């Protein structure tokens, strides 16, 4: 047992003052508060740190020389987190995250926290909690070797404005609830729940990390009194130091839920004191755009009396699991990781750090020698070393599934050209060029879109593909290489070519075949629109076949370079189902206009499939003025040629899809419900003939979209750092008692 006297404890003192005002729309009641002085992390009566964990016999000890530094993942005042590769032993080649802390920079309380973090990680084994593989120390530093989680942290995702719909939040909160419950069952209060401490693995599941502020051995009938955690996420009983139990974590879960759903914190004043007073007394303004179930859960988590808080009762987490907000969650499947996460990081190189903050990953990884600590520091960390007992067994029995051959061949600094061989051009645009490429190791063929970042910000396109590319009819993003001026997006190769090419090459084509094609495309567009995504460039050249089968299932919607995601006033993503009170009317109008443009493009495609020529251009030599005049008139022919043989039902659908007024145009949902689509198996099998040469039809189609592109300038897609949310959270250092 190692003991510390009061003289060894650091005490940065402050007072909680009485405030009577209205801040950010929150009314603060004029009630006197007890003035107290306390340390940022006053451990109170907890003066002894038990050392009960030891290195398991027979396991190999680790040291810094066994790990190759690859990249910097994060940095604080006490040290850094590196991406490393194990160089020797049964797990050679395995990637880990290495947390390096400088002993000399750690005050006594911080050393206690670090030892506590190591002890907790040794004890914990849970699918949603980060795993500790090794722990060791040198004279000047402490090392924790942890899981490397390629998805980055939720804070980075939030600051990039990806997520969060209520369905997304429901999934992440459910996994967090299981992780917190596991800690509570071990007598551990987490006490520092915030987006920065929630990581995403390569499949998109969460992993809770950073246990430096957690408190062990707190039973339900006992309380801790230390003032630890990030202020904005603190429960009232932590702020007023009247003692707290595991129930404090459920308040923090509510804060996290509120922030993920709204992009703002529920209690945040102009300074630390005001924030704490708001936590203690301010009334919470409940956003009305949230569902009743979400509002209900927030109210039950934001109970200032911890004994009344959801999860504090004798049933614990079961109270939370039974809440109607989680009614669609299968908790057993969730625990077994059988439910599909709402977001999956782009798959690619095992050491890919695209999801991490470039502020850190751009730095050269260097682990400088640590300054020797004070004389008693080594005694403090006695028993710190650890090797996970399962590390050796796992490495013997299981292949390193997350290590691709490319890592072993090319190492950590592999560039696109190290991994892929460029071949011929596939397509050339204003901001990018698309080429075929071959993986140098597997010889598999892919396509790569090379984007000039000086001409266009690719962030939105990458985020959309990462988020929605798992849909079977949306092109799949395989890898991302960010190399200075250019970004390389590696995708599956569309070997079947353009949809229109394939159709026009067929001598005969029936309504039934056309309806099957339109159904597949419209179903995909409807999925995107329901998620608040508009493509805005659905010309036929962006709809391709994955293979030569001609099967509608192999159709892929490609090129999301001009796609947009619906965002609220705070910059967060939304779905159209709950935006009325959260988005400016002109934004909704613009979104509706863009969605209507997507349907218009599908109408042009349908017209061309049935007629064999385009509706508004007679040939590739038509001028933009002529084409725009015809489009603006809203008139197109539905008589003569194939139209004399085409069903009235198809003509009715076309007239609604090509309606000149976007407000009267069909939505994707309405297209799918139209009888020509809903009863497509009953459509005529009559073979429609082709009269015009395919190259003339394609030329006319290109002229149509060229005219449209000249009519309106494409919007400039600014970096996400310019958004209101990114600016609001730009500091990357929420006021924290941890000071790190």
Swiss-Prot record:
> Required cofactors, per record?
Mg(2+)
A Pfam family annotated for this chain is Pkinase_C
The UniProt catalytic activity note for this protein reads:
L-seryl-[protein] + ATP = O-phospho-L-seryl-[protein] + ADP + H(+); L-threonyl-[protein] + ATP = O-phospho-L-threonyl-[protein] + ADP + H(+)
* Residues of the Protein kinase domain: 67-326, 420-677
Enzyme Commission no: 2.7.11.1
One GO CC term on file: cytoplasm
Molecular function GO terms recorded: ATP binding; magnesium ion binding; protein serine kinase activity; ribosomal protein S6 kinase activity
Q: What class of enzyme is it?
A: transferase
For this UniProt record, the keywords arranged alphabetically read as follows: ATP-binding, Kinase, Magnesium, Metal-binding, Nucleotide-binding, Phosphoprotein, Repeat, Serine/threonine-protein kinase, Transferase
Active-site residues (renumbered)? 192, 537
Which residues are ATP-binding? 73-81, 99, 426-434, 449
Biological processes, Gene Ontology terms: DNA damage response, signal transduction by p53 class mediator; TORC1 signaling
Start and end residues of each AGC-kinase C-terminal domain: 327-396
Known regulation of its activity is: Activated by multiple phosphorylations on threonine and serine residues.
Q: Superkingdom of this entry's organism? A: Eukaryota
Oligomeric form and interacting partners: Forms a complex with either ERK1 or ERK2 in quiescent cells. Transiently dissociates following mitogenic stimulation.
UniProt record similarity statement: Belongs to the protein kinase superfamily. AGC Ser/Thr protein kinase family. S6 kinase subfamily.
PANTHER family hit by this protein: RIBOSOMAL PROTEIN S6 KINASE
Q: What does this protein do?
A: Serine/threonine kinase that may play a role in mediating the growth-factor and stress induced activation of the transcription factor CREB.
Name of the protein: Ribosomal protein S6 kinase alpha-6
Q: What species is given as this protein's source?
A: Danio rerio (Zebrafish)
């Amino acid at each position: 047992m190692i003991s510390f006297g009061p003289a060894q404890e650091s005490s940065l003192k402050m007072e909680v003052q009485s405030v009577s005002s209205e801040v950010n729309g929150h009314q603060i009641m004029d009630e006197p508060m007890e003035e107290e002085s306390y340390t940022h992390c006053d451990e109170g009566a907890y003066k002894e740190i038990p050392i009960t964990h030891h290195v398991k016999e027979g396991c190999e000890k680790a040291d810094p020389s066994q790990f190759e530094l690859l990249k910097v993942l994060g940095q604080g005042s006490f040290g850094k987190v590196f991406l490393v590769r194990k160089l020797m032993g049964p797990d050679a080649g395995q990637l880990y995250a290495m947390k390096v802390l400088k002993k000399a920079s750690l005050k006594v309380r911080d050393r206690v926290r670090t030892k506590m973090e190591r002890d907790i990680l040794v004890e914990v084994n849970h699918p949603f909690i980060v795993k500790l593989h090794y722990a060791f120390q040198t004279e000047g530093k402490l090392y924790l070797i942890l899981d490397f989680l390629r998805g980055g942290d939720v804070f980075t995702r939030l600051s990039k404005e990806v997520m969060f719909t209520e369905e997304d939040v429901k999934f992440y909160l459910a996994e967090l609830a299981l992780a917190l419950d596991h800690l509570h069952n071990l007598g551990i209060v987490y006490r520092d729940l915030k987006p920065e401490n929630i990581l995403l693995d390569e499949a998109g599941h969460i992993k809770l990390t950073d246990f430096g502020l957690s408190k062990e051995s707190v039973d339900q009938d006992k309380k801790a009194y230390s003032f630890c955690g990030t202020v904005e996420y603190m429960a009232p009983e932590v702020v007023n130091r009247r003692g707290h139990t595991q129930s404090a974590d459920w308040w923090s879960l509510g804060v996290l839920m509120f922030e993920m759903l709204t992009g703002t914190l529920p209690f945040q004043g102009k300074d630390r004191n005001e924030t704490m007073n708001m936590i203690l007394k301010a009334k919470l303004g409940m956003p009305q755009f949230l569902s009743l179930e979400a509002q209900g859960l927030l109210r039950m988590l934001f109970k200032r009396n911890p004994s009344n808080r959801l999860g504090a009762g004798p049933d614990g987490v079961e109270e939370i699991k039974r809440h109607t907000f989680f009614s669609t969650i299968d908790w057993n499947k969730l625990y077994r990781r059988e439910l599909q996460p709402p977001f999956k990081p782009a798959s690619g190189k095992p050491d890919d750090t695209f999801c991490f903050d470039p502020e850190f990953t751009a730095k050269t990884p260097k682990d400088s020698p640590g300054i020797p600590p004070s004389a008693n520091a080594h005694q403090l960390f006695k028993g710190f070393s650890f090797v996970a007992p399962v590390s050796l067994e796992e490495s013997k029995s299981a292949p390193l599934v997350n290590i691709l051959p490319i890592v072993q061949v090319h190492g950590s600094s592999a560039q696109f050209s190290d991994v892929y061989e460029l071949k011929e051009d596939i397509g050339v645009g204003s901001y990018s060029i698309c080429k075929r490429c071959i993986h140098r190791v597997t010889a598999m063929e892919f396509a790569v879109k090379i984007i000039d970042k000086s001409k266009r910000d690719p962030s939105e396109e990458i985020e959309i593909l990462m988020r929605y590319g798992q849909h079977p009819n949306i092109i799949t993003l395989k890898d991302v290489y960010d190399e200075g001026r250019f970004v390389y997006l590696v995708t599956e190769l569309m070997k079947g070519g353009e949809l229109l090419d394939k159709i026009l090459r067929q001598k005969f084509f029936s309504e039934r075949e056309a309806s099957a094609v339109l159904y597949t495309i419209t179903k995909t567009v409807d999925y995107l629109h329901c998620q608040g995504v508009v493509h805005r460039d659905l010309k036929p050249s962006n709809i391709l076949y994955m293979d030569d089968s001609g099967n509608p299932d192999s159709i892929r919607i490609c090129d999301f370079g001009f796609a947009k995601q619906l965002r609220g006033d705070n910059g967060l993503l939304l779905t159209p189902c709950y935006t009325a009170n959260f988005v400016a009317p002109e934004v909704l109008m613009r979104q509706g206009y863009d969605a209507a443009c997507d349907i218009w493009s599908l109408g042009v495609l349908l017209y061309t499939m049935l007629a064999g020529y385009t509706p508004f251009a007679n040939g590739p030599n038509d001028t933009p003025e002529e084409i725009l005049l015809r489009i603006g008139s809203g008139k197109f022919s539905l008589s003569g040629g194939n139209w004399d043989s085409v069903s009235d039902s198809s003509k009715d659908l076309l007239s609604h899809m090509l309606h000149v007024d976007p407000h009267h145009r069909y939505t994707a949902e309405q297209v799918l419900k139209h009888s020509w689509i809903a009863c497509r198996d009953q459509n005529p099998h009559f073979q429609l003939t082709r009269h015009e040469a395919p190259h003339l039809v394609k030329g006319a189609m290109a002229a149509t979209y060229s005219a449209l592109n000249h009519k309106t300038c494409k919007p400039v897609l600014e970096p996400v750092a310019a958004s209101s949310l990114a600016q609001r959270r730009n500091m990357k250092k929420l006021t924290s008692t941890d000071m790190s």
